[in-house]
Amino acid sequence: MNPLDQLVIQAQTDFAAADDAAALENAKAKYLGKTGQITEQMKSLGKLAPDERKTQGAVINSAKEKIEAALTARRDALSNAQMESRLNAEAIDITLPGRGRGTGGIHPVMRTWQRVEEIFGSIGFDVADGPEIENDWTNFTALNSPENHPARSMQDTFYIEGNDTQGKPLLLRTHTSPMQVRYARMNKPPIRVIAPGRTYRVDSDATHSPMFHQVEGLWIDENISFADLKGVYLNFVKAFFETDDLQVRFRPSYFPFTEPSAEIDIAFGSGPLKGRWLEVSGAGQVHPNVMRNMGFDPEQFIGFAFGSGLERLTMLRYGINDLRLFYEGDLRFLKQFN
């Protein structure tokens, strides 16, 4: 056996002994690298006579091809073995039971929002929507709040740089009443509508948040009275709190957009809040100036309005003491409502 045949056999043996890609590359360098044995054989051809060079060159090339074939075969074998090992490690047992995906839930305030729409919708109230960035006129002036009213100060209202297309200052709405103004100016009486949505005020503590949710209701018609308003609201709170065992009372109050105005309190006949009067809403007869700004004759039509904080209703319904819990994103709290 000539030396080149022995070299091929040795290379095949070394390649077969390589158990990973790094070892195989080291073995390759021994035979096919810049200083490898086949490379050195090729360099020695220059010392031979032309006839010998041709003959010996063919022998060396044949040996080189056999070594390269052995290298390729071993490289493929290692690659296949690696893939098989990986597949075995990542194998899926199709007999195992599936793992369910975690599901989210409806936020408690959103539950209240949906329930409010459902209750008022069942007695014929529409649902209004409107922009959260409002102009000064719709948020304040149209609702009978004069320019020197404290609510207009930057200590209570988030103002935005710039004006609207009519030059009116822009702000984040402080209540959802502007949606009622917009709705009323586009519709004719009789009007029965609620306006739920996000509102913003410069306030933050255990019972207040700079962003909170309100629902406000508006009823405009002929020949309606406070008795109708009381009946509607009593129907609402009984349906919302799912009990007939409660009372409603109206206390005199003041709001610039209603006259007369009242605070609405409820008292439960049973449960942990039994006997306590709890404020849940403000209400009143729509002020004549507001009626005119909506485009109605206050001598012909009567309007009643009411408004409640959705967080307040949610806190009373579920016995929650701190408003900030709604916005901390704590799953331990939120999972209780799923």
Curated annotation (Swiss-Prot):
Keyword Metal-binding assigned: yes
Residues noted as binding Mg(2+) in the record, renumbered to the chain: E259
Residues that span the membrane, as ranges: none
Keyword Metal-binding: yes
Pfam families from the UniProt entry: Phe_tRNA-synt_N, tRNA-synt_2d
Localization per Swiss-Prot or TrEMBL: Cytoplasm
Family: Belongs to the class-II aminoacyl-tRNA synthetase family. Phe-tRNA synthetase alpha subunit type 1 subfamily.
UniProt name for this protein: Phenylalanine--tRNA ligase alpha subunit
Lineage of producing organism: Bacteria, Pseudomonadati, Pseudomonadota, Betaproteobacteria, Burkholderiales
